[in-house]
Amino acid sequence: MDDLTLLDLLECPVCFEKLDVTAKVLPCQHTFCKPCLQRIFKAHKELRCPECRTLVFCSIEALPANLLLVRLLDGVRSGQSSWKGGSFRRPRILTLQDNRKAKSSPRSLQASPFRLVPSVRIHMDGVPRAKALCNYRGKNPGDLKFNKGDVILLRRQLDENWYQGEINGVSGIFPASSVEVIKQLPQPPPLCRALYNFDLRDKDKSENQDCLTFLKDDVITVISRVDENWAEGKLGDKVGIFPILFVEPNVSARHLLENKGHQLSRTRHLSLMSSPSRGKATNTSSLRKSPGSRRKGSGQFSMTTALNTLNRTVHSPEGHQMVEISTPMLISSNSPSVLTQHGDKADFPTSSTGQVSSSQPAPASPGHSTAMVSVPSSQQHLSNNMFVALHTYSAHRPEELDLQKGEGIRVLGKYQDGWLKGLSLLTGRTGIFPSDYVIPVFSSTARKTSSFPDSRSPTVCTTWALSTSSVSSQGSFAEGDPRQSGPFKSVFVPTAVVNPSRSTPGPGSSGQGSLRKVRSSMRKNGSLQRPVQSGIPTFMVGSLRCSPTMVIRPQRFQFYPPQGMTPSPTPIMVEMGSKSIYTGEPALTCINRGSKTRIHSAGNSIIMEGKETPIKSEPPPKPPASAPPSILVKPENSKNGTEKQVKTVRFQNYSPPPTKHSASSPTSGKHDHPATLKGSQHEAVSSGGEMTILFAHRSGCHSGQQTDLRRKSAFGKTMPLLSTASATQTLFPSK
């Protein structure tokens, strides 16, 4: 641009004449020529700006001159063009190039009469700048060209590798690796742009009042990160939390969220390594903070009920613990030591790897899932809609829900045939998923049956039923028991019902039918909670029921297991007859009550293990030809165990003469108590024949050890010698 073109642009907006140094600047910063201002004042007797109609209170002579115009005209007349490379040079800035020209040109040393403002070097201390490390010429039109050692003014940072800067009035971009930053650019505020609308106030105003409501394309100022999925932000004068996936953060906000996320993950990892239980308690307490504990002002924002509402698994009443997914940990159901350690919390079935941990006994999961769910006993009603994913499922439609193996699901209802609608406890998302991909955590009606049709096997029909084993809460534990913290509640214990293959039909069949009725009523009622007193006669049914792995706590004359016989830690032998009962220290009473049999023991904790699968080993000693038929139950031993456990059930062929005994009314609810214990024993002898029971502790017997059990009964017969190589042998009279 030449000087003539520049002078043509400098004209008065009123008369369109060329401006000169006599032009005046009004208080509104508009510039007009002096003759135009005089004509306006003469015509209207006052001076107002022709552009904005601003009133001028001083005279025309008192108005200042336009300093920029004076400098431009001075530069044009002196032959120095003020336009360099198409960029207008700022006033009051003296570059290094101007300094060189001033020293080399003697003409510039003479003061100009029109130069009113001195050129002063700009203060560079607070200006973001960088020093060039090498020559850069650039290949694209927008690249900035500079030489080594040049000082470049930084305008903004495009990304981690590129800057936009200015040198000698020329702006462009250049790589960050070619310069050394002397003064960093001020960091932009951490902002994020909303990608979707977010509003939860209509759902639950009381619990979602701490959520930050925004619309799409709103700009939110990020304050801090709350957890992996939530951040705290400010929009206008409102402060709240919002989901991170709903916004797009800028560079500063991304760095802030990433640094906070790393700190949260590191803190959580250290807390879990140091104290898992304390970390879980701290996490739960932080999730359940009341809204009143939130800090006031724009400082740190504590996570309150809004985050708790979206991340919690179920709605629990006040004062109750929340259901939470604990760290997975598999406990072998065949290890009695582990079961003894966790005996205070729950009973573990052998076919399940689920863990139930609570302060009071709670039902364990009957399924084969590896999901670990901690449910307090006060919230057993939540088991109806709690499910665990058996397999991983990828969603094929937007309304479907992704499932991870072992993930907890809260089922909200049935969507259609084969599909359920539920809430993921891991992600908090709601959707539909196939029903065959999940399994309920608890189910009071779930039963898994498996039958062995081979008649030669030790068990003709083995049925796994989810039976209900309960202990009367009216009694008390033994004194000094450290585990006595509260009354027992009904727990689920899988039991194996072994029916003998050669039991002859007779009175026993009706007894088994009544047993099935009682068992069905037990399942309906949920538990057997009636007190049992010592000395009440009982009756043994022709079936052996035992739990493969079961932990039983003692209770003084109140233990009432429906599984039948349970061994005691010390050898016990009971002989039914007119003689006195000979037992070990833990008293065991076998008495008669009409047509039902129970064995009540007040011994210490009992662990009984056994599996119904037979193992191939040397056959047991065969009884003589004259001996009555018997069934040998030989459970499979554990892999690491060296002891063998043999159970023999022998049924006598002869039937003793029936005797009269008092029968109680089934509907009266009262039991007939015998006058003396001897009378009860005498009735048991007359009705049940002779019966010898041997309980051998697993660690108390060795292979080859024999116990002489030859004792005379009331009938004057001698029992044969029984070998007890870690065995439990029971002889029952046939029905």
Curated annotation (Swiss-Prot):
Skewed-composition ranges (Pro residues): 617-627
Modified residues (Phosphoserine): S655
GO cellular component, one term: nucleus
Enzyme class: transferase
Xref: CDD domains: RING-HC_SH3RF2 (cd16749), SH3_SH3RF2_1 (cd11929), SH3_SH3RF2_2 (cd11932), SH3_SH3RF2_3 (cd11784)
Region (Interaction with PAK4): 372-465
PROSITE patterns: SH3, ZF_RING_1, ZF_RING_2
SH3 domain residues: 125-184, 187-252, 382-443
Polar residues: compositionally biased ranges: 272-288, 367-378, 523-534
Keywords per UniProt: Metal-binding, Nucleus, Phosphoprotein, Protein phosphatase inhibitor, Repeat, SH3 domain, Transferase, Ubl conjugation, Ubl conjugation pathway, Zinc, Zinc-finger
EC number: 2.3.2.27
Pfam families xrefs: SH3_1, SH3_2, zf-RING_2
Source superkingdom: Eukaryota
Metabolic or biological pathway: Protein modification; protein ubiquitination
Compositional bias annotation for Low complexity: 357-366
Family recorded in the similarity comment: Belongs to the SH3RF family.
Assembly and oligomerization: Interacts with FASLG and PPP1CA. Interacts with PAK4 and TNFRSF1A. Interacts with DLK1, MAP3K10, MAPK8IP1/JIP1, MAPK8IP2/JIP2 and MAPK8IP3/JIP3. Interacts with RAC1 (both active GTP- or inactive GDP-bound forms).
Role according to the record: Has E3 ubiquitin-protein ligase activity. Acts as an anti-apoptotic regulator of the JNK pathway by ubiquitinating and promoting the degradation of SH3RF1, a scaffold protein that is required for pro-apoptotic JNK activation. Facilitates TNF-alpha-mediated recruitment of adapter proteins TRADD and RIPK1 to TNFRSF1A and regulates PAK4 protein stability via inhibition of its ubiquitin-mediated proteasomal degradation. Inhibits PPP1CA phosphatase activity.
Protein name as annotated: E3 ubiquitin-protein ligase SH3RF2
Source organism of this protein record: Mus musculus
Gene: Sh3rf2
